[in-house]
Amino acid sequence: MTIVKNPILTGMHPDPSLIRVEKDYYIAVSTFEWFPGVEIYHSENLVNWKLVSRPLNRISQLDMTGVPDSGGVWAPCLSYCDGIFYLVYSNVKSIYGFFKDTPNYLVTCDRIDGDWSDPVYLNASGFDASLFHDTDGRKWLVNMVNDFRPWKGTSGFGGIELQEYSCKEKKLIGRKQIIFRGSSLGVTEGPHLYHIGDYYYLITAEGGTGYDHAVTVARATKLEGPYTLSPHHPLLTSAGHRELPLQKAGHASLTDTDDGRWYAAHLCGRPITEHSRCVLGRETCLQEIVWTADGWPTLKGGGNLPRDMIEVPSNAVQERSHKAHYRFEDETLPFEFRTLRIPLTKQDYSLTERPGYLRLYGGESLCSRFHQTMTAFRQEDFSFIAKTVLEFYPDNFQKTAGIVHYYDTINFLYLFLSWDEDRGRILNVLRNRLREQSYPLEGGINLPPEGKIYLKIEVHMEHSTLSYSLEDTEYIPVYTDDISYLSDDAYSEIGEYRFTGAHIGLCCQDTTGERTPADFGMFYYEGIADTVE
């Protein structure tokens, strides 16, 4: 047996959908406005996980042009039946006010790392859609229903809807019905159905994806219900226990092992500040499940609080260090890199124009929801060093390039090169804290007219230092900040909702429209070990 420390996937890895195929385990997670859509991890031991697939990698599968911050791909459902992998996902177009526009789609593939199909449209009545394969060969879709009538008292969550899916016709068929209205916790979402023994089990998330989050279990002898709430409700929550290291526990999925054990994957948040801000976003954890004599799933060890240490049946040693050094020697972007909303095209970047460099052609501003030129790496550690080397020769103040600690279009900290008509090349900082924009260095720092500039972000928990160097030796600090505002929780403090996580991006802007290029010679990221654990 091996002791595994939670979370098993650090940084932004929310809404885990966990399955087993023979001896292989897979977890699919939400990606929101980041492209490619959905990330799928593989493990042979439940201990160490490797990113193996980013299935929604074509515009024909996923076009998120213009989607709001924290829109896009919500809560994918990964499943497997008769040699085929199925992936259901939402592409959320709007999320504010009473209404949410949430078209749901299905793609398939015979290999987890293969080319997934173009999507089949399913419905748009709500989000968190999940496909269930019953033992009789029929397939069913469940999703929460968005009820935009406030006088109904549902807070927008109208219950879990069930409808049959026809593989032959590639559409939903038959009548729709609400099979579960939820418990008193409310905000019933994230459904997954399982047929285990004599019962259908419905797993849902409740309480909202914050500090009151929870996992609810109900069961029925018939698929259509009625569903009875577990006497051990909720299965999992950290609500009311702010002393726990794992907060926001909820949105779970279940699988068994080949030796008969059961596990649940769920999301969590780890607050590190007095304001209870989770700077790494919502992460993925694992809990062992045991079944009662009368057939209810419960946490091993009793109670319903998430454990930060669990046992798994393996002799593998957990790997928790994160270090990457990209030198841009290939002709494609590194597999781990992401872009915003849509893929970069050959008009946006090149890895061949100058071998050994990533050339980014200036695009729209960091506030754009349409066509930014940015590629980013997820922050996976509370403390880290990230740096790059940049060659950039702007001739207009509207041309900028650099390294950005990015949450979304109105929440980022940007260290960049630009140009001033009186001083030539300059280094500056743009701080966009929840729409409050400022230039802390005012006019910036003069730079030599030619040559490379090394840029570095160093973060220790919530404390960030931006610095630069001309030789990659002695770095000169230019700005320090409390960057805990790059979090879901900072939005909650002002009455708004976000669901993603911080990234470190390389980017280039040219709002003259001339698409002036910037050349990046490398990207380096290393988690600092004293806070990784």
Regions found by a protein language model. Name each.
Residues 1-533:
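Carbohydrate-active catalytic/glycan-binding domains of CAZyme proteins
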